[in-house]
Structure formats: C-alpha cells, structure tokens
Amino acid sequence: MQHRGKYEFRRGIGKFGGKYQQAKGPADRLYGKNLSKVQRILILDFGSQFTQLIARRVREMGVYSEILPANTPLQEIESHRPSGLILSGGPHSVFDPGSPQSDPKVLDLGIPVLGICYGMQWIGRALGGKVEPAATREYGFTRVRVSKPNSPLFKGFPGAETNTWMSHGDEVRELPEGFVESARSHSSSLAAMENPERRIFAVQFHPEVTHTERGIEIFRNFLQICGVHGGWNLGDYATHKQKE
C-alpha cells in the first residue's frame, strides 16, 4: 500500500537504449528498423504515483523502459521480449476488492523481476507467502539493514544500514518457498526478499525516490542482473524526430 503524500518528484526523461526486438508500441515508432537492437525493461504499473519516476531511473542509465498496465495479458508482455520486469508500488492493499493484479505467470518467464512496495506484497501473495496488515504503518524515512551479504541486488553495501522511504500498510510476514530475507527495517519488518535461483527480487521501500539514499545503486544492480547495457540517449531521439 502506498500513501499519496504531499511530496512531489520531478518527472522527466533521461537516457534509454539497447538490444532486443520488440512487438508494438512507442519504441517501434521510435527505432524503426533498428528496433531489433533495443534492450528493454518493462514496468508493470499497479497505480503508483512514482511509476514514471521508475521509468526515468532506468532510462537515466541508458536503458529503454516501457510502462504497461499491471493487467496486461501475458502474451503481450512476452511479445515485448523484455530483459527484465519491474512491478511498481500502488495505493491499494492487496486485500482490497478490485486491487490491481497481474497474471502470476509473469513470474515464470525466466527473466529477472524486481517488485517495489505493493509489487513485493503481490509477489509474496502470488507465490504462497503470507501477507498481512502491518501492526504499525510505515511511512517516511526508515532505516534498513542489509542482512544478506551476497545479495546481487545489494551489491556494494552488504551489512550496511541505509535510509529508505517507506509507505505501506501491509507486509510480507512469511516468505514464499525458495525466498530468503535480504534486508530488514529497524521496526523488524521485512524490507527485502529474493529468490536468487529464479532471479526474483523485491523491496518494501521505494528505491526510485531521492529520499532513499542508495536507490540508484539498487536499480544499477538490477540492470546488471538483467544483463542490459546502455547506449541510446535523448539526443538520438531528438535527431530522429527532426528527420521525420
């Protein structure tokens, strides 16, 4: 669950680029015959006010990203041949009637997945973990300790404590099968979990906002897990548009 707070974050477009051919969408019109060279990260939007900011963070690292609704059919997601998926946060509880849902089979595509806030809770519930209302709602700055030294998502700061931005009322109480804890908050709630074999990662906080001190490193590590490389920038896009 995500609070629609008073904080506003600048929106914008940074760099993006890549490797894989995709089906249809803005990138097809943008790249034309060169689309086969485009790598991309797909972001499934569960309604977060920060979803555009997630896309910006990825693009700023030179990797193309696209945002799709959370309920996008599995076949359409597969047609994009993404290098990785990011599941956004959202304002709902996973227990709310009509709360956003994705096809659980998106977790079986064999590509890396990063769940954020609601995305983490959705993963936990979809894979058989226990998600419950938190005893105390976490909102605002929260200290988090990395508890898994060899976590690829937290590469570069194992054992470290860092400030994060939390905004949730539900939490994962019991891990899904095959998952391990990778970070915990000072209030003793689970802050991150992962299944290294399936390359599914999830964080309860928001790495996309500047309030999270090392959020950029988390995105950089996730893109490394996905095996994507930057190489396309906004200047190329401007040149392309001028030639149209």
Predicted regions located by residue number:
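Gly/Ala-rich beta-loop-alpha elbow adjacent to hydrolase catalytic centers
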Residues: 115, 119, 124
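Short, low-complexity intrinsically disordered segments enriched in A/P/G/S/L with frequent Arg
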Residues: 26-31
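Cationic, low-complexity basic patches in intrinsically disordered or flexible, solvent-exposed regions
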Residues: 3, 7-9, 16, 20-22
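RNA-binding accessory domains that recognize and position tRNA/RNA substrates
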Residues: 33-84, 93, 101, 107-109, ...
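Structural motif
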Residues: 86-88
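Conserved pre-ATP/AMP-binding loop-to-beta segment of ANL
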Residues: 110-114
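Short, intrinsically disordered, low-complexity terminal segments
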Residues: 20, 24, 156-157
